[in-house]
UniProtKB/Swiss-Prot annotation:
Protein name: Tyrosine recombinase XerD
Active site residues of this protein: 147, 171, 243, 246, 269, 278
GO MF annotation: an example: DNA binding
Upper taxonomic lineage: Bacteria, Bacillati, Bacillota, Bacilli, Bacillales
Purpose: Site-specific tyrosine recombinase, which acts by catalyzing the cutting and rejoining of the recombining DNA molecules. The XerC-XerD complex is essential to convert dimers of the bacterial chromosome into monomers to permit their segregation at cell division. It also contributes to the segregational stability of plasmids.
Similarity remark: Belongs to the 'phage' integrase family. XerD subfamily.
Amino acid sequence: MNDLIEDFLHFLIVERGLSANTIKAYERDLRYFVSYMDVAKGLTDPNTLERSDIVGFMAFARQEGKSARSVARYIASLRSFFHYLMHDGKMSHDPMIQIETPKQAQGLPKVLNLDDVEKLLSSSDTSTPLGLRDQAMMEILYATGLRVTELVSLKMDDLHLHMGFIQTIGKGDKERIIPLGKTATTVLEKYLEEARPKLRRPKYRNDFVFLNHHGQGLTRQGFWKILKGIAKESGIEKPITPHTLRHSFATHLLENGADLRSVQELLGHADISTTQIYTHVTKLRLKDVYKQFHPRA
């Protein structure tokens, strides 16, 4: 089975051109399934799999505390894997027939209000190179709605500050161009002029915009650690994740009159239904405002 997984991952890289993060997610899901089947059935040949094995795996995952969202992702990964094996003639039947994807509760994105955004953006110690970097990253995230992977992947050639925009490669290798406001541009220029040269190291000749203290490009995990520190310093009691500023970016645009299609393009969503979730957030926030300020609410 492990050899078949390697073949599948190679197919995803070469034929479908999926991102490294997506490939890792597929691999993680499939390895989890194989580890379960090794214990449950001593699996070596996928042709021995039956529908009951998939049902048993789903039950096992839920017993381990996996969410409905995680189980749904496992099922999607297995469907793709088995479809590949059948198409390649390495599997004679589909054990996923009549397997239903678990229904997921549609959670609304967590959004910061403007006061909390201001606290978060002003909580970095800008007297140090790393603090200037952190402030610039926070400003860029809120100003552009970038995903964290897109942020840490930014290269110097992606910046067009004199023209007021940056470019990025998002999901599905789709390029998009995003305007950059004056505040974010000013903060970013300060970081590039005063802090980044101090973080660069001769042995690491890379052109990533945001560098760690070793002079290397930041990782998503590295950014997550930085964000936790900034969130703690800000005193904001709400949970803050790497996606919080992206959610806030989208919601605040819609609240101030931006049309849904423009927000979809800025976020890089392939399907507008993904963007529509933010309209539900704005409606709930309007309801809260009404209850708070209308005399007969």
